[in-house]
């Protein structure tokens, strides 16, 4: 029974990682291209690439105390992941209105803050249900799958942007 539960959790973790890979490969890797499309200056683009991750990293100092306001680690990780995913819908809506730099910078700071807030809790959570004896093998396999999905998502997103760019 316990072995089946562990297998199920490991599978779900790999599926979750695949969705993250799609978000990363099909989204995050194109944020600078989005900034170029919006005709931001080179300095604005560099600041947009560097400042939000820095803000997110600083926010990690507070993520543990925020996590403690949730029922458990699982609810914190799931809630923050959901919020981070929903931010992509906000970005798509913003893009329809040709947003100013300020709005993209604010969006990016919130996006990176939610993502980096998740990391310590996610790592602790994985430690609870990935048995030590299989951790290295499991994460090696999981990372290969996620890397491949991220690669595909990046190529597909680039192809879609090429089609969109040709039709403008």
PLM feature segments, named:
Residues 115-131:
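Intracellular juxtamembrane helix-capping segments at the cytosolic ends
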Residues 42-43, 130-142:
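Loop-to-transmembrane helix entry/capping segments in MFS-fold secondary transporters
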Residues 1-63, 67, 74-85, 89-92, ...:
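Helix-loop boundary and gating motifs at the non-cytosolic
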Residues 77-99, 105, 159-163:
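C-terminal ends and interior cores of transmembrane alpha-helices
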Residues 53-60, 116, 140-158:
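Glycine-rich segments within core transmembrane alpha-helices of 12-TM secondary carriers
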Residues 29-37, 65-69, 91-97, 150-168:
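Transmembrane alpha-helix termini and helix-breaking/packing motifs in multi-pass membrane transporters
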Residues 21, 25, 112-120:
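Small-residue-rich segments within alpha-helical transmembrane domains of MFS-like 12-TM solute carriers
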Residues 62-67, 126, 135, 157:
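Hydrophobic/aromatic and small-residue hotspots that mark the transmembrane alpha-helices
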């Amino acid at each position: 029974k316990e072995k089946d539960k562990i297998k199920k959790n490991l599978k779900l973790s790999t599926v979750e990682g695949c969705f993250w890979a799609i978000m990363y490969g099909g989204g995050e890797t194109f944020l600078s291209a989005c900034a170029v499309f919006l005709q931001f200056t080179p300095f604005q683009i560099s600041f947009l690439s560097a400042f939000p991750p820095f803000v997110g990293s600083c926010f990690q100092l507070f993520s543990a105390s925020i996590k403690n306001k949730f029922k458990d680690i699982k609810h914190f990780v799931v809630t923050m992941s959901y919020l981070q995913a929903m931010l992509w819908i906000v970005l798509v809506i913003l893009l329809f209105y040709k947003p100013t730099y300020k709005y993209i910078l604010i969006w990016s700071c919130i996006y990176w803050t939610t993502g980096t807030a998740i990391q310590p809790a996610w790592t602790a959570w994985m430690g609870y249900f990935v048995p030590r004896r299989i951790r290295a093998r499991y994460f090696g396999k999981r990372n290969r799958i996620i890397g491949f999905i991220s690669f595909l998502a990046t190529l597909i997103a680039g192809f879609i942007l090429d089609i969109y760019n040709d039709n403008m």
